[in-house]
């Protein structure tokens, strides 16, 4: 009987190996290449053959192997629990960030502390009703501008502020954003209630903001003034994709739609399991691994064979096209609209601190990855030069690239090169108020109160 069972085991193992090797030819495999299931069947076949060869000795080998694997499993569990304790002690923010991503459905993370969710047409907004390191969002995912309750009557001036993370207020509290300071400046200058609604979103470009404005107008939310604060993200999206007018993360989203395994986050099972462990969080906390799973290799417009001058011209042309559409909407709906090209660390003549020099050159810790790329620096400077020539005769488009030229103290807060301090936000808000302050305090009073 023992010989018969060994023979059956050998025969069964050979059959399994044959099935795994011929699965593509026999139609048992739906894909091409050697799939995960084929590897599993192959291992089962080898396991059966080993059992057939060893016979009675296989039981002893199996028992010893099982005990060894059980001890290894216990060791891994203890190691993972220990890693969890260490991470909570030395890097609690990393653990809380991962939990916020899981609670939000775990989809999109564009900035270290800002979790986004998918929204039709504009692609993403911050997760609604969330408090993240001093940043509060409302039920729609928009940044709150304190005080959240302002008298809503016919005398209140409503302003919608659109932009990317600089207008959103990345890195500062709710009471230190451009929107907050602008609300104070206008209320003081006009001596009437002012409500500045921060409609900016991290990493959004001007075309996404224009679509957001359309959605607000369609919903019946018509403000008195609309402000667009842009420049950096329009250039950054063109830099990484070689396509003017694109949004950031184009290749990743494009890859998901077209089934690119890397863009869809498909990674080997073993790596996926490892990345879900607390030990992986620990390795990330001490800088030994990256939190990005199998990232797509970085590219720039040069990799796509796009010339600097033509891309810069296209970026400016599309931006100006967006300003034309927004102006037409303002005429149709009866609101005033203004456009501002935001300051950045690569343009203008600001005296830079040692830390800011590191941000500009891409050499500081956490610096904007393309910052050290000469192609990036050339593109953003070229775009701003073309913008300056194109907007010289347009009264409601302002170039703020010189906003900090006389500022001796540090303003830029991180390697992005566009995020600024609370003091910098106050300076921008004061200049905005001077540029858009109506001569008549009742000049903007025709629209009904929009939704906040």
Briefly describe each language-model feature range.
Residues 130, 158-160, 166-269:
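Conserved SGNH/GDSL esterase-like catalytic core that processes O-acyl groups on lipids
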Residues 13-27, 233-389, 405-410:
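Serine-dependent acyl-ester chemistry module
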Residues 55, 59, 178, 182, ...:
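Catalytic cores of nucleotide-enabled group-transfer and carboxylate-activating enzymes in metabolic
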Residues 2-3, 319, 391-396, 412-452:
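Histidine-centered active-site loop/cap adjacent to the catalytic His
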Residues 61-87:
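Internal/C-terminal transmembrane anchor helices
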Residues 8-55:
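Membrane-embedded alpha-helical segments of integral membrane proteins
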